């Protein structure tokens, strides 16, 4: 169950950068 974690981590990074 690492796919969800990775997705969340990447999503958080993108949001922080301001990239949709």
Swiss-Prot record:
Secreted into the hemolymph. Keywords: Hemolymph clotting, Lipid-binding, Secreted. One of its GO terms (cellular component) is extracellular region. The keyword Secreted applies. Its main location: secreted. One of its GO terms (biological process) is hemolymph coagulation. Residues 1-20 form the Vitellogenin domain. The keyword rRNA-binding does not apply. It is found in: Secreted, Extracellular space. GO terms for molecular function: lipid binding. It comes from the Eukaryota. Involved in lipid transport. Plays a role in hemolymph clotting. May be involved in wound healing in the cuticle. This is Fibrinogen. It comes from Pacifastacus leniusculus. The lineage of its organism: Eukaryota, Metazoa, Ecdysozoa, Arthropoda, Crustacea.
